[in-house]
Amino acid sequence: MTSVTKLLRMAATAMALAGATSGRAALYEFQATGGGHYTASWSGPAQSIPDNDLSGVAFALDFPATGLRITDISVRILITGGWNGDLYAYLSHGSDYAILLNRVGAFSNGADGYSTSGLNILLQPETTHAGLADIHTTQNPDAPPTGYAADGRVDYTDTSRPQTLDVFPDRDPNGSWTLFFADRSPVFGSTLNGWSLDITAVPEPVNPALGCFAGMFLLVTLVRCERVRRLFRRP
């Protein structure tokens, strides 16, 4: 497949993700928990993931704080029942999106994926957590605190993984986020029991040019004030 075709396919996928139907009406707002950490979470009541239904279940989130830059991000997911090889999930913010799950264990020569049932996992970026195993090839993942790398595959048959959680560090977290889950194959429905999204963020660095301009403006202001005072002190 050519690089141009690949890019077009990724763009089409991103557009499809942006148009996903929301499955819940509530808006989940990130809360500051101290030390630059912000968390949004949901723990039920349990939500069935519609079986073999691409509309899935979507959660709308909002990050109200401004002037920040993401340094780390993690997603915890708790799912029971079903067939893990059917599951698909993504996290999106603006034009950026990460594919969290894409039919774990499914390959071109085995499209059913892993038959294991239920997931209790922590997904993290590989750039900030070295040595993570790829969740797509992990049949029986350990529960947190063990972390795994998000799937990242646009198609479950891909070998490249451009859409992992590594797309988010250095981005501005402010604004709307979407967390989406779907079951892409018939039989063996899964139940979503909870999730949490944790973001670590720091203040945006001051632009050196703006800082220099501000310093010059302050200096000029002080000089002018001194000149005015001298005028009033003249006999």
What spans do the regions from the language model cover?
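Bacterial N-terminal signal peptides that target proteins for export
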Residues: T2-A11
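A short, hydrophobic C-terminal helix/tail in secreted or cell-surface proteins
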Residues: E204-R224
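Bacterial N-terminal signal peptides
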Residues: M10-G19, G215-M216
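Loop and turn regions of beta-sandwich accessory domains that flank beta-strands and are enriched
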Residues: A26-A201
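C-terminal membrane-anchoring or membrane-association module
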Residues: L219-P235
